Amino acid sequence: MSDKPLLEIEDLNVCFSSEGKKIPAVRDVSLTVYPGQTVAIVGESGSGKSTTAHSIIDLLPGTGQVTSGSIRFDGKDLAKASKREVVAVRGSGIGLVPQDPMSNLNPVWKIGFQIRETLEANGIAKGKAAKQRAIELLEEAGMSDAARRVNQYPHEFSGGMRQRALIAIGLACRPKLLIADEPTSALDVTVQRQILDHLDGLTSELGTAVLLITHDLGLAAERAEHLVVMYRGKVVESGPALQILREPQHLYTKKLVNSAPSLASQRLSSVRERIAVRKQAVQVAEEVAAADAEIAAVSDDVVVAQNLTKAFKIRGSTPWKSTDFVAVDDVSFRLKRGTTTAIVGESGSGKSTVAQMVLGLLEPTSGSVTFDGREVAKLDRKGAFAFRRRVQPIFQDPYGSLDPMYSIYRTIEEPLRTHKIGTAKEREATVRDLLDKVSLPSSVMRRYPNELSGGQRQRVAVARALALSPEVVVCDEAVSALDVLVQAQILKLLNDLQAELGLSYLFITHDLAVVRQIADDVLVMQTGRIVEAATTDEVFQNPTEEYTRRLLDAIPGRDLLAG
């Protein structure tokens, strides 16, 4: 590693203007990145980490501007450089992998064209050479069948595939510095590992430096030599990664270490807490069941799936030709009252399709889902209405699952009104209580989804799911969009509510790190089938399948605290 810094930020201040006032977003931030080095900026939403990164290449949103300080890249101060000089540095000097693949890919252009555009704009390749290089870059970013994928549009890609396309674009010009802004937040842990391994390989091969922006301290400590911890626009701690992980000095850093699921999953305290929650939840669930003679007569199993299969018709090369794609293949499991069963697997494993069949949103091709002894697909209108009240979902995407035209109050109050629960005043009190439970101020009630962060939106989705006091909650990647601190908070909330109300959870996730804190039983799915089913402890201590071992090995920072 060279003694001369590649990037040197000193006393950087960034402000945003609102109603004539200047609001500081980044305050006196200093950091250094050397050639070939990986430095991670860690912090929760709103800490200023992305603002710091975007100020380097003059891509601050809206009214954001650098008010003081210097940003020296390769000897040149970009804070004082002209627009043309900064644009010349982008791509070949500094590459960017942005966070949100939906808003950073053009929906009307093919993926291959968007990669070629980067290559041609920077004079790397043209024509056939650019087309071939686009395929190679997608392959490097971990995408199978890249030759076919380059001719597809962003809407034909899953979220993870779109993120890989952005990574291919960011690395296209072999930059000296790559700014990776939450580059794997949309990816499964195994793909996350593959992508980050690739970034590591690139760093060592080409001497490319990486500035990694993340909220996961476990991931940051595993991938970076140096950590910069930010809180409310300031750097609160900075130093070698392992030192910060094992001996955090600042209170906020200690909180991050305690909250990261990848690290918490290794602690025995997580296991002990889960055992206590299960014991209490099962007891409460039995009391609730005993109070209802109809329920008590059924069994301890609140949801039973038997030989579930779901096939989708895939359009062929001509309109009259189609093939069957089997998304779920002969899946059976039981969800006991007051417990949590986690379904774990990569994108495309069929876990969300199982969740939709349990919720009655998809009808199985064959097999059945029974809730309290009644088959969900055969419920009449009245039975289906009652079922909706007793089984509630928390969906994966907080952007798509909330109506943008509804205020937060109306969003949470709507299920109460639909099921004719309480007076208007009582419903308002319930909404306030639910917001408090998910750590949101009551002032949020008057706001709309577009005024909230992704994490806040997901907390609203959790509050809405709990509004009807359901017996079963189906959580489809319910915490994947959240910062680690909020993630830990929501997992604790779900545990507390389970113990208090005797709830049963079907927890869909790609992240085994989260599972240990919330689940009692685990089903591991791969390409539509269950490949392993066991208790959480058995899966963590003695996995029988190679695929499960791969998922466990992919948990970021898994062995750092032990080492």
Where do the model's predicted regions map?
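ABC ATPase NBD coupling module
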Residues: 23, 78-95, 113, 121, ...
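Helix-to-loop junction immediately C-terminal to a conserved catalytic motif
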Residues: 57, 61, 359
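Conserved ABC transporter NBD signature motif
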Residues: 65-77, 367-375, 387
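Conserved ABC ATPase "signature" region
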Residues: 77, 129-148, 375, 426-443, ...
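Conserved ABC ATPase signature
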Residues: 152-157, 161, 448-452, 456
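ABC ATPase C-loop
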Residues: 165, 170-171, 460, 466
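A short, proline-enriched helix->beta-strand linker immediately N-terminal to the Walker B motif
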Residues: 172-176, 467-471, 487
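ABC ATPase "signature
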Residues: 235-239, 247, 530-534, 542
